Every structure is written in structure tokens, then in C-alpha cells.
Amino acid sequence: MSTAPSPTITSPTQTSPVVINKSLICQDSTVSNGVQIAIGTVLHPRSSIIISEGAGPIIIGENNIIEELVQIVNKSPEPMIIGSNNLFEVGSYIECKSIGNGNVFEPKCKILKNTIIKDQCSIGAGCIVSEDKICENNTIIAQTQNSQIQTTSTLPYDHHSSIHMTHLELLHKSIPLFHTIKKTPILEK
């Protein structure tokens, strides 16, 4: 997994979420204490980033898009590290060990515990990635009518990377027009 710039852990017992300036967190999203979110990330309304009792922090890199009803949950005592430029689409459920950069998680996919998703992967709508799995760079997992298939290709990443920054810019302009933005402790970068 490539190393994505991410905020430093200030304290495993910090009392509030830490958000680097220029991230956008909607008021009706849920963010646990101990979560760190880097610059540019957008949390849509009704998204949740939850640290269970006794679990480690969740550290989220730059420029991620976390859409409605997404649940990112850490139940492990180890930190959950999420890289940069990822797209988590509506209703996806993430309970993994780590995620690299430039990945797409389509609606209602599930990533189960201890899973490692490396860089530029695409997890299809409704797919379930089993516990303890490692998805190497450019892995594609898709659901057919009767089964789940896995292959590798750069095509999904090429498409995702070509529109991701434009998508982020649009969200940073439009979301504050229609939603209240959460006031959180801000670290200037």
C-alpha cells in the first residue's frame, strides 16, 4: 500500500474528532471521538464514522468522499487507516484494517474486518469482501446474478481519477448551500 499523507495521531484518548481545515462534515453525520480527518474530505449527511468501545482510532486521509448512509466502523484495538482520494458510495459498510488510495466502494458493498484494500481497487455494488482478505492494487470485485467475480484492471481507477477532484470541488460548493456544516476542532495545516 502506498503511503498516503495522513494526520498524526494526537492521542488515542482525544475527546473530540479532529478535522484538518477545509474538510466538510455535515451536521447530521456521526463522527466518534478519536477520528482524524485530513484536508478536503467530505462527509455527506447521515454518514457515520464510529469507533467502538476499546477500539483504536480511525485516521482518514485527504480528499475522500463519504456519501449518505456509509458506515465506517473500527471494532479493533488497532488503528484503522484510510488513505486519500477514495469514494465511499451510498450505504457501503466498511470494517477493515486499512484502505489505500484511489479506491471506489460502490453502493451497499461490505468490507469485513481485518481486510486490507490496497490502491486503486473497485468493489462493486452489493459485493461482500470477506474477513482477512487482501485486495492487491487494481483489484475489481463485481457481483453477477449468481456469484461474485474478481479480476484486475486499471480502467475503473482511470475513470475515477479523471473525475474525483471535480466531484470534490462541486461538493465543497454545493453541500454548504443545502446542509448545516458541523463545527469541530480544526487544525490548520
UniProtKB/Swiss-Prot annotation:
Compartment list: Cytoplasm, Cytoskeleton
Record's protein name: Dynactin subunit 6
Predominant subcellular localization, coarse grouping: cytoplasm
Subunit structure, as described in the record: Subunit of dynactin, a multiprotein complex part of a tripartite complex with dynein and a adapter, such as BICDL1, BICD2 or HOOK3. The dynactin complex is built around ACTR1A/ACTB filament and consists of an actin-related filament composed of a shoulder domain, a pointed end and a barbed end.
One GO cellular component term noted in the UniProt record for this chain: dynactin complex
Cited PANTHER family: DYNACTIN 6, DYNACTIN SUBUNIT 6
Keywords: Cytoplasm, Cytoskeleton
Organism the protein comes from: Dictyostelium discoideum (Social amoeba)
A biological process from GO: mitotic spindle organization
One function term, GO molecular function aspect: dynein complex binding
Lineage, top ranks: Eukaryota, Amoebozoa, Evosea, Eumycetozoa, Dictyostelia
Family assignment from sequence similarity: Belongs to the dynactin subunits 5/6 family. Dynactin subunit 6 subfamily.
